[in-house]
Amino acid sequence: MAKGKRTFQPNNRRRARVHGFRLRMRTRAGRAIVSGRRRKGRRALSA
């Protein structure tokens, strides 16, 4: 019986486009996410 493929197929360009910093800065909610992560002291603010 054939199994399906793994669902996570890493791709850096897609990762940046979907979760990246520029995308976060585009919307008010995204900026809120980044500022919250800054406040918390996260090492990485976004992908």
From Swiss-Prot:
Species in which this protein is naturally found: Mycolicibacterium paratuberculosis (strain ATCC BAA-968 / K-10)
Coiled-coil ranges from the UniProt annotation: none
Pfam hit, one: Ribosomal_L34
Segments traversing the membrane: none
Organism superkingdom: Bacteria
Protein encoded by which gene: rpmH
One example of a Gene Ontology biological process annotation: translation
GO cellular component: ribonucleoprotein complex; ribosome
Keywords, sorted A to Z: Ribonucleoprotein, Ribosomal protein
Name under which the protein is recorded: Large ribosomal subunit protein bL34
PANTHER family per the UniProt record, alphabetical: LARGE RIBOSOMAL SUBUNIT PROTEIN BL34M, MITOCHONDRIAL RIBOSOMAL PROTEIN 34 FAMILY MEMBER
Disulfide bonds: none
GO molecular function: structural constituent of ribosome
